[in-house]
Each structure stands twice: as structure tokens, then as C-alpha cells.
């Protein structure tokens, strides 16, 4: 098993989970193709994390990418940046800028 993470990514976890659904239960090559054609910002971030996990497998254990499959994709909520928006009569409303922690675990088939 080879793991790669990206933390504090400025993508809402709800939207990132949609992009993560594109790569679940696929081989690494298929997932890369799916994410390369995805127009979501989260898809670009997940592709970078997937490439990092593949590089970990290739450099540490000399495993070919054709033999790898995705074992787990996890999108967790990170901390929120809190901003304020002015409202009528001197009021204000909170705006929450959400962040995500992305984790991709790849391994050999049949593992």
C-alpha cells in the first residue's frame, strides 16, 4: 500500500467527494484518464495526489503503474476560514470558506 495526502486544499469537501467518486474501484490508469478530463477543481487536485501515490509506488518498490489499483480515496473536511459579509442595517453574516484533506491509497491488484 502506498499513500499520498494533500492537506488544506481550498475545495469544498462536498464537491471533492463528487470528483473522488470518479476514481473509486478503478485501476490507476483509468482513474488518471477520468481525472484528466474532469473540469472540476477537485479533479485536478486529486490527480496530483494520485500521481504522487503512483510515484511513491514506482520509486520505493519498483512496481509498474499497470499493476496498481486504487484501494482507498478519502476526502475529509479541513478547517474553515471565517469571513464576514455586510448585511442591511449594520448587520453581518458569516461566510465559511471550506478546506479539504485528500488521501489516496494505491496498491497492487488482489491485495
Curated annotation (Swiss-Prot):
UniProt keyword list: Ribonucleoprotein, Ribosomal protein, RNA-binding, rRNA-binding
CC annotations in GO: cytosolic large ribosomal subunit
Ranges annotated as spanning the membrane: none
A single BP term in Gene Ontology: translation
NCBIfam families hit by this protein: rplV_bact
Record family assignment: Belongs to the universal ribosomal protein uL22 family.
Complex formation: Part of the 50S ribosomal subunit.
Protein name per Swiss-Prot or TrEMBL: Large ribosomal subunit protein uL22
Highest classification ranks of the organism: Bacteria, Pseudomonadati, Chlamydiota, Chlamydiia, Chlamydiales
Amino acid at each position: 500500500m502506498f499513500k499520498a495526502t494533500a492537506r488544506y486544499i481550498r475545495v469544498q469537501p462536498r464537491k471533492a467527494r463528487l470528483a473522488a467518486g470518479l476514481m473509486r474501484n478503478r485501476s490507476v490508469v483509468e482513474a488518471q484518464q477520468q481525472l484528466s478530463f474532469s473540469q472540476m477543481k477537485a479533479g485536478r487536485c486529486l490527480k496530483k495526489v494520485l500521481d504522487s501515490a503512483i510515484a511513491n509506488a514506482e520509486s520505493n518498490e519498483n512496481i509498474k503503474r499497470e499493476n496498481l489499483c486504487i484501494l482507498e480515496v478519502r476526502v475529509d473536511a479541513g478547517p474553515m476560514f471565517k469571513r464576514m459579509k455586510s448585511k442591511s442595517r449594520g448587520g453581518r453574516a458569516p461566510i465559511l470558506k471550506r478546506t479539504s484533506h485528500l488521501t489516496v491509497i494505491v496498491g497492487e491488484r488482489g491485495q
